[in-house]
Amino acid sequence: ATPLTSVLTSYGCPAICSFCVAGKINYQYRAPSNVISELETIKTLGIKEIFFRDNVFCANKKQGHLLMNMMIENDFGFSWVADTRASILTDETAKIMKKSGCHALHIGVETANPIILKKYNKGVTIAEIRDAFRICKNWGIKTVGYFIIGLPGEMVEDIKKTIDLSIELDCDYASFNVALPIIGTELREEAVKNNWVNSKNSSKYDGSFEPKIESENISLEKILEMRDFAVRKFYLRPSYIVKQLISLRNFYQVKSLFNEF
């Protein structure tokens, strides 16, 4: 496997999504020169791959562009991946990302319902999401789309539209996750107030797919059923299977693909 490490260029998140605690942390970023010093040390260790673990890489575009241009000037030769937001991605930013070694981006989509996006303060439009995935494809940057199943206010038809959007965006990978009322979020407060919380381990973020919220629209069982349906519909398309078989290069890619099931 390629030697890999993670790097933080910023801490916290400038976004205020109601289902996430990262926005509660004061957003701070490191000076690009400080990050470059760390990357210089990393290169001496033989590391080839970087995972920038920022909640939103390049949230401050001025600092992000400066860092990536410094990476290009230093000719580190790293390939890298990061989490970012659809609203950040422009042709200019994607061009610098690609030139500095970016080969994949993780992008939160959450839902195809614009009303739900607004309700939970996502701060991104469906049009921006479509543009972001199109831009990534144009620049040869692979994408992982993140989707939430079962946000309060959603109907089954909304979830089906979200699944359809994941296919329309033509993500290289899609991660379908059930809504989780994490302590400290507005989503948690809403769930408790309306008695939507599944009391058993409802506050525990254990990384499982167990549904934690039950609203008047969708039962816990239905949420899990729709999550499984989403995975099957996205990953078992003949065209997708053929594309992945052609592109798979090693065991780790195969393992990550099957982890969704």
Features from the language model and the residues they span:
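Radical SAM [4Fe-4S] cluster-binding motif and immediate context
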Residues: 1-146, 164
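Glycine-rich beta-alpha loop elements in corrinoid/cobalamin-binding modules
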Residues: 178-184
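Catalytic cores of alpha/beta
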Residues: 92-95, 152-168
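Conserved beta-strand->loop/alpha-helix structural units within folded catalytic cores of enzymes
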Residues: 136-146, 151, 165-177, 236
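Pocket-edge positions in alpha/beta enzyme catalytic cores
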Residues: 27, 121, 151-154, 215
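Radical SAM enzyme core and accessory elements
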Residues: 186-261
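Residues in well-ordered alpha-helical elements
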Residues: 33, 127, 156-160, 221
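Histidine/acidic-residue-rich catalytic or RNA/ligand-binding cores of hydrolases
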Residues: 64, 159, 188-189
